[in-house]
């Protein structure tokens, strides 16, 4: 495997005090954790109420992993703007995603779905489920999005097995 430096994703590290107000407000609510989950709709789920089906699937995965309390954190790659002129518009902010990952003390990111993985900086051709790499000094795992898991429920078990194997391999 190439050294981690060769697999960096370009972003400008932004200090939390320079983040837009909506990102600062969310950061104040998010707890630190070694394992960070992200998906395209996460910002919406955190700020406007979680989609029940996504919440059910995510809870099932997290519970099945049997990680100690305080392991998981959730940090979005997208967040809807909160200013009147931008109401409802969702944009991805790679710089704020990776700055947040650093701020939260994350060692491993689980990116659910192609859209989120591309938003955080993976080249489209590198995005595939049940794959891992080292990017920006953290382990980045890509898995299916919620729609793909719902299409084939056995994928949920595949995600759990893959992540548990990663934990063992990396001693996390």
Labelled PLM ranges:
Residues 1-172:
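A polyanion-binding, active-site-adjacent surface
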């Amino acid at each position: 495997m190439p050294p981690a430096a060769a697999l960096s994703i370009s972003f400008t590290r932004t200090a939390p005090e320079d983040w837009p107000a909506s990102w600062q407000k969310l950061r104040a609510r998010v707890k630190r954790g070694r394992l960070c989950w992200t998906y395209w709709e996460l910002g919406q789920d955190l700020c406007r109420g979680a989609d029940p089906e996504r919440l059910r699937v995510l809870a099932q995965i997290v519970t099945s992993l049997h990680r100690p309390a305080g392991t998981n954190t959730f940090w979005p790659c997208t967040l809807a703007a909160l200013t009147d002129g931008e109401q409802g518009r969702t944009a991805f902010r790679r710089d704020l995603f990776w700055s947040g990952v650093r701020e939260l003390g994350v060692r491993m990111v689980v990116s659910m779905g192609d859209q989120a993985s591309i938003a955080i900086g993976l080249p489209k051709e590198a995005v595939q489920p049940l794959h891992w790499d080292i990017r920006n000094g953290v382990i980045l795992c890509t898995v299916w999005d919620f729609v793909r898991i719902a299409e084939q429920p056995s994928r949920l078990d595949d995600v759990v097995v893959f992540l548990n194997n990663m934990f063992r391999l990396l001693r996390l």
